Amino acid sequence: MVVTAYPKSSAGMGVTVLPEYLKQSSYEAYSRPYSAFFLSGCTKQERSPLLARRLVDAWLSFHSILMINEEVSDWEQLSDHYTRRSLFKTIAFRNLQREEEYRPGG
């Protein structure tokens, strides 16, 4: 699975959103296993459909970056390298870095 991610500062929280060409059915098929993984690491106050979607969007974009960079080749390696919370922080930081790189005049 390779998902092309486009940086969008309007997405909030430094999270890159999925491309529009991915239909809702495809999104749901991709997101189901990953949302369960992320939400199990959240507190009760952090659980919401919007947060779940943002976490899944972040996971998909971050996973595609890792696949391209050949840093991590599969899910098991990824879960060995990062905890749930540090993974999200890393995702947000990397996406903010990417937004800076693509910002006009930046």
From Swiss-Prot:
Organism domain of life: Eukaryota
Location(s), subcellular: Mitochondrion
Broad class of the protein's primary localization: mitochondrion
Entry keyword set: Mitochondrion
GO CC entries: mitochondrion
Name of the protein in question: Uncharacterized mitochondrial protein AtMg00450
Other facts: A stretch of 270 kb of the mitochondrial genome is duplicated within the centromere of chromosome 2 resulting in the duplication of the gene. The expression of the duplicated gene is not demonstrated.
